Amino acid sequence: VDYLERTYAAGKIPGGFFRREGRPTEKAIITSRLIDRPIRPLFPKDLRNDVAINLLVLSVDNDNSPEIAAMLGASIALSISDIPWNGPIGGVSVGMVDGEYILCPTAEQREHSTLELTVAGTEKKVVMIEAGAKEVSDDEMFDAIMLAHEEIKKLCAFIAGIQTEIGKPKFEYTPSEIDAELYDKIKEFCLEDIRSAYSTDDKN
């Protein structure tokens, strides 16, 4: 996933002689990872085709964050394409101001929020959670996740409707098969060494 924010999306032009965009910002890189995490596990495990998702922010205000819209755009694009994928997914951000949950809070609301939660998932399960908070209880966090998932179900149903209306048939591919005999030999040769490497507390 490649998420790009251009300054012209906010009505600005870069300064300097060349007036070109620089490398992706840290926020753009983190957003790319945020969108990639819930999407990646839903591809068939034996699919070996390279899939690139490019998300370009064309216009945005300074009050609403474009990350969730980009995640939904990626979900819709994959759903209506011919790429095999076990979506759709939906994504929601949740804040909490004065003890009240707020879905997709604005920039001003986020400044006063004691919870910053992003949830992504399918109609049946939550796939990804990213959260930061100023001391919220376990029950409050659980309720926020459940609230987010209820909204995600609605978004998934909406995207499924789009897929039904304009989606392409998924292409057929030849599954990648693992040589069982070779797998067993590799497992016998190095499994214990791998386990030892993962469990060691030696930093050298």
Q: Which residues make up each language-model segment?
A:
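Glycine-rich, flexible beta-strand/loop modules in the N-terminal catalytic cores of phosphate-handling
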Residues: 1-51, 57, 64, 123, ...
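Short intrinsically disordered coil segments
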Residues: 16-18, 69-71, 108
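Short alpha-helix boundary/capping segments
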Residues: 23-30, 65-69, 133-147
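Glycine-rich anion/phosphate-binding loop at the beta-strand->alpha-helix junction
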Residues: 35, 45-96
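Mobile "lid/hinge" segments at catalytic clefts and subdomain interfaces of large enzymes
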Residues: 82-201
